[in-house]
Amino acid sequence: MDDYAVLSDTELAAVLRQYNIPHGPIVGSTRKLYEKKIFEYETQRRRLLPPNSSSSSFSYQFSDLDSAAVDSDMYDLPKKEDALLYQSKDYNDDYYEESYLTTKTYGEPESVGMSKSFRQPGTSLVDADTFHHQVRDDIFSSLEEEGKDRERLIYGQDSAYQSIAHYRPISNVSRSSLGLSYYPTSSTSSVSSSSSSPSSWLTRRAIRPEKQAPAAALGQDRQVPLWGQLLLFLVFAAFLLFVYYSIQAEEGNPFWMDP
């Protein structure tokens, strides 16, 4: 692995792309991991290739960072050998799918062949998950549409139900005089008569009269009116005052003496 330590970050990224190894930005903490992956890849490659292969040894020469002359024939492997290599390594397909889709190669564009080769292992799983999510979304959307249709049947007959005035019952005379045709009556259409919600609105009592109802009931329960109670209180007070003055007159002044 010492041979990879002399490579720069750009050169190491080129080797990773050449071997179709997914990678992210090369920093100090991830460089050792990528060097280890390249070393394992080279080891497996030597086992799969014939002994007399000229590409068994690792030789990577760069003349300049801007103009990198890489022998492509040395690192190009057939697709069959690549498949055998990854199967022998027992890599996790989910890891390759996630790492390739979430990471981005910095510095150089990605090749189309790499994206196809790494997306193939998880294509069936992604398609299955997408299908299940689509079916679930369709079910939820159908349920929402059914709920909206029910609301339209109940509340869609007129837009005046949102007002607080529908809680106040109005007689037929006042309704006809005011010209309020949106209150359901006994001669409504078949749609309004079939629904029980509009008829239940009229049976509700008014909000404000309910708050005033206890006071009205208290006034009806009184046997003596309020003015009568005040009159009795004044008479009783006058009687007590008369008794007090009469007692004071009988006792008289204790310092007063008869001549």
Curated annotation (Swiss-Prot):
Modified residues (Phosphoserine): S8, S29, S54, S72, S88, S99, S141, S142, S171, S174, S176
Mutant lacking the gene: phenotype: Early and highly significant depletion of primordial follicles.
Family annotation (Gene3D superfamilies): 1.10.720.40
A Pfam family this chain is assigned to: LEM
Tissue expression summary: In the ovary, highest expression is seen in primordial follicle oocytes (at protein level). Detected in embryonic fibroblasts, skeletal muscle, heart muscle and tongue epithelium (at protein level). Widely expressed.
Key word Isomerase present: no
Residue stretches making up the LEM domain: 1-45
Keywords: Acetylation, Actin-binding, Membrane, Microtubule, Nucleus, Phosphoprotein, Transmembrane, Transmembrane helix
InterPro entries named in the record: Emerin, LEM/LEM-like_dom_sf, LEM_dom, LEM_emerin
UniProt name for this protein: Emerin
Residue span of region Interaction with CTNNB1: 168-187
Gene Ontology CC terms: cortical endoplasmic reticulum; microtubule; nuclear envelope; nuclear inner membrane; nuclear lamina; nuclear membrane; nuclear outer membrane; nucleoplasm
Record-listed N-acetylmethionine modification sites: M1
Membrane topology note: Single-pass membrane protein
